[in-house]
Amino acid sequence: DLTAAYTFGSAGPTLSVASLWWAGQGAGDYFNFKSHETAHHFEAGLAYTLPIEKLPLSIAWNFMFAGQDKDENGNQNYSSYVELNFPFTVKGVDLNATCGVLPYDAGITTYGGDVNSGFAVTNVALKATKDIKITDSFSLPIFTQAIWNPRMEDAHLVLGISLRP
């Protein structure tokens, strides 16, 4: 996936454009960008965080404007995804609550082959991050995230570390 993004000012909205490749290895020519042949999804996004210290809610709206996101007649679906994020801290642990939705019917096919027929909650998540002090000069940032997709009746638990220079 390739993404270019620009944030307007220090606290303004962020505009992004992405080329998403979900086809995997051996799925065709990565550099084929022809509308009805490409395996790319081209997506535009707009994100903004409310400038309210006690309510740092962010909202992002992304939609596919070209590429493989087609309906059964070969027309562009303009599939969209809207996500809300709310960061907060409890007892020294940084948390982030997420809720993502498909706002309308755009012919999106789920991994199980079902077509989404309208508004659907597709991402409910809670992520916890904590820096574990190893020495006076080094901390290990660890995280865990519980993710649930009610539309697909699917859940995941992710554990990880972040290494920064």
Sequence positions of predicted segments:
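Repeat-unit-sized solenoid/scaffold elements
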Residues: 77-100, 164
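Outer-membrane beta-barrel "beta-signal"
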Residues: 126-128, 153-165
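Outer-membrane pore/translocation modules
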Residues: 1-85, 106-119, 158
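Flexible domain-boundary/linker segments
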Residues: 3, 144-145, 161
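Outer membrane beta-barrel transmembrane domains
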Residues: 94-135, 139, 143
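Short, exposed beta-strand-loop hairpins at the edges of beta-sheets
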Residues: 146-151
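Short loop/turn motifs that connect adjacent beta-strands in outer-membrane beta-barrel proteins
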Residues: 7-16, 49-57, 87-97, 129-142, ...
